[in-house]
Each structure stands twice: as C-alpha cells, then as structure tokens.
Amino acid sequence: MAVALTLNDLRKRQAPDGSIDVVIETLVQSNPILEDVRWAEGNLPTGNQTTQRNGLPEVHLRQINRGVPVGKSSTKQVTDTCCLMESRSEVDVELVSLAPDKEAFRTSEDMAFVEAMGEAVAHHMFYGNSAKNLDEFNGLGIRYNKYGGKKHDASYQVINAGGTGKGKLSSAFLVGWGDRAVTGIYPKYGYAGLKRQDLGEVDAIDANGYKFRALSTLFKWKPGLAVKDPEMVAAVRNIDLGAVNAAAATVEQKKAVVDAMIRAQGRMRNLNTVHPVWY
C-alpha cells in the first residue's frame, strides 16, 4: 500500500491556485474525523487487498545436538472495496445572475454538497455495512461487532460495557491511523478525496419534466476503509448512554465506562507508531 496522506497533505499537492482549499476546509470543519484519516492508494482497481497475519510461529528452547520443529506463521487475505459516491448541484442561471458576486454565490451553494459528501464518508467509516447494501464499504461498527474472541482476533479488541437493549446504546472506538494500521483508501490509479467538476451551463429538468438552464457541478468521491492490522483498533460497545448521561448517574457508572476504555486501549500495541484517536 502506498504512503497514506491526510487531507491537509493532499491540499499541499493539488491545485496550486488554491481552488481545492475551500473544499478541504469545508470537509474538515463538517467532520473532524476526515482530518485524522490517512488516505492511501489501494492495490486493486476496486479497492485494496491486505494480507493479515493471524498466527505467530512457536518458539522452542533448543538443546545441544538436538533440533527444533519447523514453525511458520499463518496469514489470511482481506479485500476491502471502495464505494462510489456522487452528487450534483444545479443552480438556475437566472438565480445566479441576481447575485452581486456570482462565483461566490455558486460556491456557497456547492459547499452544501461538499458538507453532505463529507458527512456521508464519515458515516460509512463507522456504520457502513456491505451485507445490507452492496454499494457500501464496511465500517468499523460491522468489523468490530463481536467481543470475547481470542487474541489477534478483531473480537478480542472489543470490550463489552454491559449495556442492554432497554436504553440507548452507543460505542467508543480508538483508531490507530497509519500506513500499516488503518487507512482510508481509494482505487488503484484513482484520486484521493473529493473531486469537484464544473459542468458549466446545462439543461436541468424540474419536477414536472420541464427544462431550464442551470449551472451544474458534479461531486464524486470513491472512498473505502482498510484495516491492515486488526489490533490497531479497539472498541467499547454497549455503552448505556441513559445511565452515563442521566442526572442520577453514579460515579461508579461513569468510572466503569472510563475503565472499559482503558482496558480497550491496553489491547492495542505500539501506539507510538500510529496516530491514535478516540471517537
């Protein structure tokens, strides 16, 4: 996998005229997670294939004139796909003509679409589920939805906070962003981040099927998520928000959530090699 870059890194590499700045700033302001994500080019036209080590070889103590068994590690391959997100802005040319600063007016209209795209990507990072919708990529919620597994399994990284279905349940995720850990991905030979294309003046169609002239902008993003090392994510699931946020919540109840987060963080290794963030 290629070296992963943040959106701010990409800002420095694209559009010397600064036209990309306003897009990136809007994305980051609408969802801070988009500033944390490292984006890397996948090794497939549709995403990325990662080889994960899921077992270590045994180590033996050797005696003089005696050998040891041959050992080996075990691995598995995981394929992560990118999805295709698109949206179009169409602003009536007559409406634009009324604005004192036409370009600024059109940009302000477009930024609503930029913010919506950012929210969609951030949502999929946690809640995407390809089993329910093949067009989505799997988010952290579906990848870490079980607990109690063996070490090196994703389920081992999950701590159960003990909440039940009676109240509103939530989760907390600790993500270690990094080249060899967790990254956002885009297709091989593709582009990172949101692409905004000015389509110029086109025929738009109203609700009755009638045409009018409009200035159109196409927004496109092909994001995905790759968890190269499952131990670079930890989660606390089934947090009872009613018990924690309620006025009657006890110190012990709040402390239990903090203790669960500390336990979860303890299951991540080499935190100094990644950019860890709680969500």
Where are these regions (language model features)?
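N-terminal low-complexity, intrinsically disordered segments
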Residues: P45-K76
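Short, low-complexity, charged/polar segments at coil/turn and helix-coil boundaries
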Residues: L34-N43, Q52
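Core alpha/beta structural scaffold of self-assembling particle/tube/pore-forming proteins
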Residues: A2-E35, G71-Y279
